[in-house]
């Protein structure tokens, strides 16, 4: 344990500023308090850049996901079980931008935690809750897309509003109960008492997680990931087969006679493709962080602080990516944004506006 503590502390001493950017001599987070954490502040230039980059991510996550939620909840055309899942996912990303990223920005740039011990624990709970809630939502969305693509005509009777509500409830309750229970019972610190003692200082917010719980955390990420990869592989095969069938039929009939089933299948495949990109973005953003967590827990916290900070912020930035993906691939979302931004959403009967091209 002593070696593990030494390894961790030596890793923490190689701060992001010392590795990447020149910084002034170390200072204390609280100059007039005994037991204050040490900080190595950035010079003004890099400090301003980091605040701009991290702050932009937080603003984009809040505003972008607020637009997604407003669009889906306001416009009646978007009131579907699948879209309610998307809105709930946007809510998780919105809360990351509101309750996690702004405070992490200050911690990452200043090297200190100025928001109290109570919110330090809440901050960590929010971080875990919203991450797992996102991956559970994406897992259910992938299953929804599989049903829609494999049999689009009976899909409305299988994935109903009730089923969507149960998926949303499960995603939120399990994530919140797990994250808060783990951190508030102190189970994550079992066997790491010496490390926790070494980390404790005024102005710090380091949450230690032992090997057992790091492994469980990784499984909670890995299992839904494998489910999504399997489901989207099947969706890809079905979509490929449907495209081949449509191509064969097009040689025998004119495009004008395209069946209703084919049109529905084409629309569902496009939706599956867009949401598949969102899933891929989530996995690419969070997988490096979880792999690093496993490596750190079993090799004595060897990751330099600047590497950890980079991985954390790549993961955080995922919360800002989905609105950009929707805006790029969904014409209806671009139209909804225009109506919201211009204030036309406040007009009477705006909720029945047609968002889909003829």
Swiss-Prot record:
Q: Which Pfam families match?
A: 7tm_1 (PF00001)
The superkingdom listed in its UniProt entry is Eukaryota
Where is it mainly found? membrane
SMART domains reported in the protein's UniProt record = 7TM_GPCR_Srsx
Q: Gene3D superfamilies in the record, alphabetically?
A: Rhodopsin 7-helix transmembrane proteins
Query: Which sequence ranges are listed under topological domain Extracellular?
Result: 1-47, 105-121, 188-212, 296-309
Keyword set, alphabetical order: Cell membrane, Disulfide bond, G-protein coupled receptor, Glycoprotein, Membrane, Receptor, Transducer, Transmembrane, Transmembrane helix
| Compartments (UniProt record) | Cell membrane
Q: Does the keyword Ligase apply?
A: no
Q: Which InterPro entries match?
A: GPCR_Rhodpsn, GPCR_Rhodpsn_7TM, TAAR, TAAR_fam
Which chain regions cross the lipid bilayer?
48-68, 84-104, 122-143, 167-187, 213-233, 275-295, 310-333
Which residues are noted as glycosylation sites? 34, 210
Q: How does it sit in the membrane?
A: Multi-pass membrane protein
Any GO BP: G protein-coupled receptor signaling pathway
Instruction: Give residue spans on the Cytoplasmic membrane side.
Output: 69-83, 144-166, 234-274, 334-358
GO MF terms listed in the record are:
trace-amine receptor activity
Q: Which PANTHER family does the entry mention?
A: HISTAMINE RECEPTOR-RELATED G-PROTEIN COUPLED RECEPTOR (PTHR24249), TRACE AMINE-ASSOCIATED RECEPTOR 7A-RELATED (PTHR24249:SF78)
Family per record: Belongs to the G-protein coupled receptor 1 family.
Protein name (record): Trace amine-associated receptor 7a
| UniProt source species | Rattus norvegicus (Rat)
């Amino acid at each position: 344990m002593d070696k593990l503590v030494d390894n961790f502390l030596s890793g923490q001493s190689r701060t992001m500023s010392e590795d990447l950017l020149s910084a002034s001599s170390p200072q204390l987070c609280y100059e007039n308090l005994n037991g204050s954490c040490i900080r190595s502040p950035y010079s003004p230039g890099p400090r301003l850049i980091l605040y701009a980059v991290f702050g932009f991510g937080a603003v984009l996550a809040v505003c972008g996901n607020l637009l997604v939620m407003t669009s889906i909840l306001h416009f009646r055309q978007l009131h579907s079980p699948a879209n309610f899942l998307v809105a709930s996912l946007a809510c998780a990303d919105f809360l990351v931008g509101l309750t996690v990223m702004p405070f992490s920005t200050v911690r990452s740039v200043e090297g200190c935690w100025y928001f109290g011990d109570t919110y330090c624990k809440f901050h960590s709970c929010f971080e875990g809750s919203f991450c797992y809630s996102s991956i559970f939502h994406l897992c259910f969305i992938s299953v929804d897309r599989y049903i829609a693509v494999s049999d689009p005509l009976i899909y409305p009777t299988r994935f109903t509003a009730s089923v969507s509500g149960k998926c949303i409830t499960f995603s939120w309750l399990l994530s919140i109960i797990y994250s808060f229970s783990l951190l508030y019972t102190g189970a994550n610190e079992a066997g790491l008492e010496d490390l926790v003692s070494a980390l404790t200082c005024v102005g710090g917010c380091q949450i230690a997680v032992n090997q057992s719980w790091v492994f469980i955390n990784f499984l909670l990420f890995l299992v839904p990931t494998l489910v999504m990869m399997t489901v989207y592989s099947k969706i890809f095969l079905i979509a490929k087969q449907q495209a081949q069938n449509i191509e064969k039929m097009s040689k025998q009939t004119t495009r004008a006679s395209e069946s209703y089933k084919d049109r529905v299948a084409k629309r569902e495949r496009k939706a599956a493709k867009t949401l598949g990109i969102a899933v891929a973005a989530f996995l690419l953003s969070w997988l490096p962080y979880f792999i690093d967590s496993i490596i750190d827990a079993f090799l004595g916290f060897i990751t330099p602080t600047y590497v950890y900070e980079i991985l954390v912020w790549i993961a955080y930035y995922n919360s800002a990516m989905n609105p950009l993906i929707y805006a790029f691939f969904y014409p209806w979302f671009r139209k909804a944004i225009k109506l919201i931004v211009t204030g036309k959403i406040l007009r009477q009967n705006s909720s029945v506006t047609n968002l889909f091209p003829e």
